[in-house]
Amino acid sequence: MPAKQVAFAEHAREKMLRGVNVLADAVKVTLGPKGRNVVLDKSFGAPTITKDGVSVAKEIELADKFENMGAQMVKEVASQASDEAGDGTTTATVLAQAIIREGLKAVIAGMNPMDLKRGIDKSVIVVVEELKKQSKPCKTQKEVAQVGTISANSDDSIGKIIAEAMEKVGNEGVITVEEGSGLANELDVVEGMQFDRGYLSPYFVNNQDKMVAELENPYILLHDKKISSIRDMLPILEQVAKSSRPLLIVAEDVEGEALATLVVNTMRGIIKVAAVKAPGFGDRRKAMLEDMAILTGGRVVSEEIGMKLESTTLADLGQAKKIVIDKENTTMIDGAGQQSEIKARVEQIRRQMEDASSDYDREKLQERVAKLAGGVAVIKVGAGSEMEMKEKKARVEDALHATRAAVEEGIVPGGGVALVRARHALEGFKTANHDQDMGVAIIRRAIEEPLRQIVANAGGEGSVVLNKVVDGKDGYGYNAATDEYGDMFEMGVIDPTKVTRTALQKASSIAGLMITTEAMVTELPKKDDKSGGDMGDMGGGMGGMGGMGGF
């Protein structure tokens, strides 16, 4: 086990605070509409330019081990705020720095760190309740666009396109962000259920201009195994042929004789058929087939529930208004499933989302909800260069998270005003003792900091603006983008309640732990290791390998 170094009391706190300040000072320059960019060096490729707090925080590693521990703990604040609310990372970092700075001053003055932490925790609960009282529901498309615009650094084109996407696919719909090929942002909406499997044979194509297979009012056969023998399928094919309606087959695979027979019958015009592979793998494939069955009002033909392909009837098949299949995707439009069953399935998947342990599983479950409930919208980000594309894509993703948070928990005045307004809830708030009261005072001072920083980044004087805002009421605040005072809701400067709440809770949680730190332990820095210097002799010895040419 390598030797360790230990720092205690003042020395430990001083080093920790230095690390916190380095990271927070780099992150907080990005706050607000007039926040600056930060350039991040990459080990390969061009540098990345960003205004996203968590991206800056993730890049910072300090040489001094003790300082680095302080920086890493504040990095955790930004990461947690990003994970839970998707935005507010810079606000969380600014709040954490302010709480730690004021808290450590109080510890140095002789206050009890544990009581300070208790006071901080109690006052955060009061402030969060006050934020919830200020919160208004985010209902209109205009409000959604305003939230997106603020989060995307006052880029109203991003706010508008996100609001449009949310209106088209609903709050439950999936909105994905991709790199576009042009200069302008584009919105592509897929209604109905789409999955990433195309036709198994190009001979199924019946629209030669678009190279797609279009099936109007088709039956849909869902099977969870491979189909290789046509004999099993003959009974159901005959029933479908009599009905004169097309058929889509979704199975693990359709191959050999079965595929050849389907192609021949389609080309001769005896029956209009298309076959695609089922999406996903393993248990996820079974779940998605079941989703399709519920959406189309059919059943999955599965031996697990005692059903056989040869005994399938038309009543077991799903139906839809239209199906479009291209080389890579299949889209089912207007399935014939019962709305009550679809709703119940969506609720079931939502419960699974709450229990999901990984982000990947949660994302896949969210996609399934969207395919059942709404649709899928793709925002294609346009930019003039690769560097701009990366920066813009990150902003669109941030804005998307913020708008989802706004729809979920509502909106409060932006620009740091909501936190300043929440201060009055702490006036006269008394705790068990003087040291805990000091913890309350620390939060009262810290929640001014986001407003002060936004003003400082805009080139103003924080204290002057703060006093004017404090004298106002409700949504009255300072719009740093236009350098005007007024009602923040009317000016469209709004923040999601969830983002503001999460930023404060995460910042106070980790700051409280850091204030109560009394010792720090880390490995001793390693001396430069010169063990690679003796390898020069190997060049001569390797020459004998030339004889291997005989092979």
Swiss-Prot record:
Forms a cylinder of 14 subunits composed of two heptameric rings stacked back-to-back. Interacts with the co-chaperonin GroES. The gene is groEL. The keyword Nucleotide-binding applies. GO terms for cellular component: cytoplasm. Its EC number is 5.6.1.7. Together with its co-chaperonin GroES, plays an essential role in assisting protein folding. The GroEL-GroES system forms a nano-cage that allows encapsulation of the non-native substrate proteins and provides a physical environment optimized to promote and accelerate protein folding. This is Chaperonin GroEL. It comes from Acidithiobacillus ferrooxidans (strain ATCC 23270 / DSM 14882 / CIP 104768 / NCIMB 8455). ATP binds at residues 30-33, 51, 87-91, 415, 479-481, 495. Signal peptide: none annotated. Disulfide bonds: none annotated. Pfam families: Cpn60_TCP1. It catalyses: ATP + H2O + a folded polypeptide = ADP + phosphate + an unfolded polypeptide. Belongs to the chaperonin (HSP60) family. Gene3D superfamilies: GroEL (3.50.7.10), GroEL-like equatorial domain (1.10.560.10), TCP-1-like chaperonin intermediate domain (3.30.260.10).
